Swiss-Prot record:
It comes from Rotavirus A (isolate RVA/Monkey/South Africa/SA11-H96/1958/G3P5B[2]) (RV-A). The lineage of its organism: Viruses, Riboviria, Orthornavirae, Duplornaviricota, Resentoviricetes. Residues 1-48 are annotated as: Interaction with VP1. The keyword 4Fe-4S does not apply. This is Non-structural protein 5. Residues 153-166 have a biased composition (Acidic residues). It is found in: Host cytoplasm.
Length: 198
C-alpha cells in the first residue's frame, strides 16, 4: 500500500483590498499565534493632529476619523508590525514604506510552500500447511502401546461392587479381585466382633 500527498504546487491566494493594483507586501503563514500591533508614529500623524486640533469639537464628524483619512490610514497600515501575541516581540525586520500612489491599496499574498510525503508499505504473506499435523497424528497412533485387557469374573454374586463402596470400584477388573473381597469380608467380621465385645 502506497500513499503519497504532494502540496508543493498549490497556487498562491491573493486578496486585493480597495483596488486591483499589485503590491510588494507578502505575508507568510506561521504555526505560531500572531497578533497585529499598530504603531501610529509617522510624519503624517503630526499634521493630522494639527488638523484635528484646529477644528471645533462640534465640527468633527465621521469623515474626519483616521480610518477615513487616506494619509493617516496608510501610515497606520504601513507602520503596523507583526508581533507574537504571547511575548509581544516584533517579528518584522523593518516596516516597508509604500509610494504615495498606492494610498488606499493593500494586497496581501498568502503563499503555502510545504511538501508532505507519506509512504507506507505493507507486505504480508501467510502460508498454512497441514501436512505436518497429519504426520504427527500418525506417529502418535504408532507410539501408543496396546496393553492386553484383563478380565476377571467373580465366582459369587456377593463380590459384585456397587457405587456405594468406599474404594470407588478401583479393583473392579483386577486379577486379585477374589482375594480382595475375601479379605474385606473378614475385616468386616472382625470389626463387628470388636464392636460387640465393647
Amino acid at each position: 500500500m502506497s500513499l503519497s500527498i504532494d502540496v508543493t504546487s498549490l497556487p498562491s491566494i491573493p486578496s486585493t483590498i480597495y483596488k486591483n493594483e499589485s503590491s510588494s507586501t507578502t505575508s507568510t503563514l506561521s504555526g505560531k499565534s500572531i497578533g497585529r500591533s499598530e504603531q501610529y508614529i509617522s510624519p503624517d500623524a503630526e499634521a493630522f493632529n494639527k488638523y484635528m486640533l484646529s477644528k471645533s469639537p462640534e465640527d468633527i464628524g465621521p469623515s474626519d476619523s483616521a480610518s477615513n483619512d487616506p494619509l493617516t490610514s496608510f501610515s497606520i497600515r504601513s507602520n503596523a508590525v507583526k508581533t507574537n501575541a504571547d511575548a509581544g516581540v516584533s517579528m518584522d525586520s523593518s516596516a516597508q514604506s509604500r509610494p504615495s500612489s498606492n494610498v488606499g491599496c493593500d494586497q496581501v499574498d498568502f503563499s503555502l510552500n510545504k511538501g508532505l510525503k507519506v509512504k507506507a508499505n505493507l507486505d504480508s504473506s501467510i502460508s498454512i500447511s497441514t501436512d505436518t499435523k497429519k504426520e504427527k497424528s500418525k506417529q502418535n497412533h504408532k507410539s501408543r502401546k496396546h496393553y492386553p485387557r484383563i478380565e476377571a469374573e467373580s465366582d459369587s454374586d456377593d463380590y459384585v461392587l456397587d457405587d456405594s463402596d468406599s474404594d470407588d470400584g478401583k479393583c473392579k477388573n483386577c486379577k486379585y479381585k477374589k482375594k480382595y473381597f475375601a479379605l474385606r469380608m473378614r475385616m468386616k467380621q472382625v470389626a463387628m466382633q470388636l464392636i460387640e465385645d465393647l
